[in-house]
Amino acid sequence: FNIKQKYTLAYDLASTFTNTIIPSDKKILDDEIAYVALHFVNYIDENSPQKKKRMLIISSLRRSETILLQNNILRNFPSIKEVKIIPKNSLSTTNVNNYNVICTTENDIFINNNKIQKISYFFNDTDIKKIELLLDGFNGPKDILDCFSEDLFYYGDAPSKNAVIKRLYEMAYKQGLADEKLYHSIMNHENVTSTYFGNYLAIPHPEIFLSETSFISVAILPKPILWDDEYVDIVFLVSIQKNNPNAFKLWSYLSFLISNNTTLEEIKKEPTFQNLSKVISKIYEDLF
């Protein structure tokens, strides 16, 4: 499930693409979609607006170490146009408005400027996810939390996958967020590919973007149910706003959450909307 969790947007695009070219009576395997998804990852990287973006890093590392850091960033983000590293004493004479993303390895710079994000000297996996989110325009936990609502939260038993989807859809319908077209699109998608994402989590969603507003309906189940040959006890029904090129970034924002098994367990430990909001807010605040 690594590709499915890490490259959620590319996987969803690959799923939609394969569904349009494969006969509807054929079930597409996750591994087959994952293979196609890798091609979408490469295409997105090559054609991403990130190619025009510039990154500034303030660091007191030795030159040999800054070169290593710079190379690590460019290797992980080949679409970035420029990574410039400057010492602390050059910050006051640098036009930071020329840069899309600004980071530092220095704790004092980070503490004194809330627009500058801290990264590690060693550039670890957390730093990679942090830069991914920054490049995608992530401003903070609110970008994700706005898609959740207590009116779209359910904790209780469910007899089957279809019953969970129906309940989550009906909650969204009552709030004026969904219609029957959306529901049928979700079920059509379920018929051709699995929406199990690992870590006992399923994310049913429509074949295409249909809703006027992005939203996420949540179900936490005290007893796991069977979901495409796997067991599930937490379900996110995700719908992305249509006709909004920036709305699809929600998939990127969610990938950090859905690949984090510890976080999902914390959500299930106290199955309330208040705890869900608290846990989601904390993991993104800790990241930044």
Name what the model sees in each region:
Residues F1-S90, V96-N97, V101-N112, G140-F148:
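Short hydrophobic beta-strand micro-motif common in sensory/regulatory domains
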Residues I28-D31, K53, S64, S92-F288:
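Cytosolic covalent-transfer regions centered on His/Cys nucleophiles
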